[in-house]
Amino acid sequence: MRAQLAEIRGETSKTQTRRGAIDKIVRLKNRCPPQPGLITSNVPVHLTILGSGSAGNCAYVETPEARLLIDAGFSARQIRQRLATIGRTPENLTGILVTHEHIDHIQGLRILAEKLNLPIYCNRATSDALQYQLKVKIECRLFATGGCFEIGDVQVETFSIPHDAQDPVGYLLRTNNVKIGFLTDLGHTTNLVLQRVRSANVLVIEANHDVKMLQDCPRRPWSLKQRILGRHGHLSNDSAADAVQEIMTSDLRYMYLGHLSRECNKPELAQTVMAQRLEKIGANHVALSVARQDVPCPTLSL
């Protein structure tokens, strides 16, 4: 009996040690302040994830010559409210970059485009899908997937990503010696995707689900589970970690995990999986944060 108790205590001690190490990793990686606030810094580039998850995605990038949204996946009212937390308004936007036509990326697009006459940037297939889905004609500024163009002092590099939309894209924004990569909604990472974001200083990458939580979820039909797990679905926590390991360089300084499923993932789980991988590959220079659905992240000023 004593031997059994000693063995149990030993296993408990090991478990506590492992948990303590993981907690330490998470604390080290999550260096951002806890609350969003007004943009007051004089540095040239600001990034605010206004919200990210299965119910809506929207990010804000500000430079001296551009104020851009990447997707508009919340209602126009919600986007206005979230911009207000950082002292900004939709009226001052330079344009909106659209990754693809799914509703969690375009919910507020019609009202923003109609009322404010904002430029909408997307490719031809996405533009056609927008007209059909929103039941209204939206004038879009078209680009060819794989091409580059400029908005003020921002060079926008586009590239194809594998997702079940018409012609989904990722973005790499280059401005003022800063490179910001956006990788959400993709079922796997191709060599092209990895090549395009390898030079990023900031990476927003989806960690949509934990595979076991998804498989066990009683509210998801099997057909939906197959779609999410497929090669044109969404990245799991482990798949996101694999991708980051592939592209890791000393240039990558900040990372946001986005598009987390409320039912099939947990922020602390996604963060722990990525933090452990960063620790394993010696990437202690990367500050890791998890984007939330309901509140903006603190602004990152670069």
Label every PLM stretch briefly.
Residues R2-E7, I22-N30, G37, E268-L302:
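C-terminal regulatory/interaction regions
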Residues E7, D23-I25, K29, P34-I86, ...:
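Conserved beta-strand hairpin/beta-sheet module of binuclear metal-dependent hydrolase folds
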Residues T48-C58, H100-L109, S127, T158:
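Structured catalytic core of nucleotide-sugar glycosyltransferases
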Residues A55, I103-I106, S127-A129, A165-Q166, ...:
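Active-site environment of divalent metal-dependent phosphoester hydrolases
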Residues R77-C122:
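Active-site metal-binding motif and surrounding structural segment of the metallo-beta-lactamase
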Residues N123-V178:
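Metallo-beta-lactamase
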Residues N191-R292:
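Cap/insert and terminal regions of metallo-dependent hydrolase folds
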